[in-house]
């Protein structure tokens, strides 16, 4: 199962999974990706849970 948490450090709309992933790694998550949240794309960090 994968748990997601919105990134606290990522600023602005998320268009690059690579950038999101890099920011999530600084937040001690193994990976991250952009996901649609209402009208905005946000960076979500993921880990196995």
From Swiss-Prot:
Task: List, alphabetically, the SUPFAM superfamilies matched.
Answer: Scorpion toxin-like
Q: Which Gene3D superfamilies would you find in this protein's record? A: Knottin, scorpion toxin-like (3.30.30.10)
SMART domains cross-referenced by the UniProt entry: Knot1
Q: Which UniProt keywords apply?
A: Antimicrobial, Defensin, Disulfide bond, Fungicide, Plant defense
The highest taxon in the source lineage is Eukaryota
Q: Name one GO biological process term.
A: killing of cells of another organism
Q: List the disulfide bonds.
A: 3-49, 14-34, 20-43, 24-45
Family label: Belongs to the DEFL family.
Functionally, this protein is described as follows: Has weak antifungal activity against F.graminearum and F.verticillioides below 30 ug/ml, but not against A.consortiale B.cinerea, H.sativum, F.culmorum, C.graminicola and D.maydis.
The name on file for this protein is Defensin Tk-AMP-D1
User: What is the organism of origin for this protein?
Assistant: Triticum kiharae
């Amino acid at each position: 199962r994968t748990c997601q948490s919105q990134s606290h450090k990522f600023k602005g709309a998320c268009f690059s999974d690579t950038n999101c992933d890099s920011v999530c790694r600084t937040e001690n998550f193994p990976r991250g990706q952009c996901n649609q949240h209402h009208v905005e794309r946000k960076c979500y960090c993921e880990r196995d849970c």
